[in-house]
Amino acid sequence: MVTAMVLINVQRGQINETAQRLLEVDGVAEVYSVTGEYDLVALLRFQNYEDLASVVTSHMQQLPTITKTHTLMAFQCYSRADLQQAWDIGIV
């Protein structure tokens, strides 16, 4: 599984519309409105890098309300759910 976070800036007043349109794209799992330098953070999950690249370079760039993106690739996931499962089956 390939996971990426895309930090997104959008045109003024277009946060809600852009978030909804992003959620229509296959592979976009979640979209958050955030404070700070960026307006939205999209969490993307794909089976391969080619599909991720297609969404970031083609689909997202076709949305006229998106003015800037910055993509972060995830190397490893640390989560409470994973840790709890490890304890439950005696790995840890």
PLM regions: where:
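A compositional/biophysical signature of low hydrophobicity enriched in polar/charged and small residues
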Residues: M1-V92
